[in-house]
Amino acid sequence: MKKTILASSLAVALGVTGYATTADHNQAHASEENIDKAHLADLAQNNPEELNQKPLHAGAYNYNFVLGGNEYTFTSNGQSWSWNYTAAGAQSATSNSVQDVTTQATTNTNETSASEVSAQKQSSNTPVAAVEAPKASSNTQTSAATRTYKVAQTSAASTGGSVKAQFLAAGGTEAMWNSIVMPESSGNPNAVNPAGYRGLGQTKESWGSGSVASQTKGMINYGESRYGSMEAAMTFRASHGWW
């Protein structure tokens, strides 16, 4: 996936120590600095919204390292910042590039393969892709499909900690967050795709908007009523690419 974020402010570092800049290039590499690689990797895997909100610290930096079979890159030129990770040696990555630190709107662009799109058929919650494979076709397609999300101007209530913390406090689980929320909306409670699907679980139903707590309860009710249990809903999402 490739996500482009327009953030509202340029903030300071979040829990990352040992960053420094050089007098000549105003940049630092992970191999040269004592950075917390495990913490950065955990943010990229489990808390991408924190990385999307602000750079690691003020000024330019360039951190690149391999950990746990994935290659991570965090860069900034002092005005915009980006981060990405991918399986070591792979060609596709999950990346975020923040282009304008003063704008109020946020745009996320997720790139997925068309083979994934072919699995996204009749779900009332799946984002509509720009390229749709024929339903009955079993041919492998190599062209890329792009999904675009735009954040609504009215955001969900953010009191009570991060989006993930609110999600877990409202009855959500780590498994739901990783297998449904992150693939559907990247953890953005205000994500809206061009077809009108919205929220953490990407739906057109009423529970797709409002507070994180109300969206979480709506997801649970939907999963249990449609699939019998959230475990069954997660299994279906994992095998079909939509739910």
Swiss-Prot record:
Function noted in UniProt: Is able to cleave peptidoglycan.
Organism (species): Staphylococcus xylosus
Low complexity bias spans: 99-116
Any one GO CC term of the record: extracellular region
Keyword Iron-sulfur: no
One GO MF term: hydrolase activity, acting on glycosyl bonds
Keywords of the record: Glycosidase, Hydrolase, Secreted, Signal
Principal place of residence: secreted
Top-rank taxon, per record: Bacteria
Signal peptide: 1-25
The protein's name: Probable transglycosylase IsaA
EC number, UniProt record: 3.2.-.-
Subcellular location: Secreted
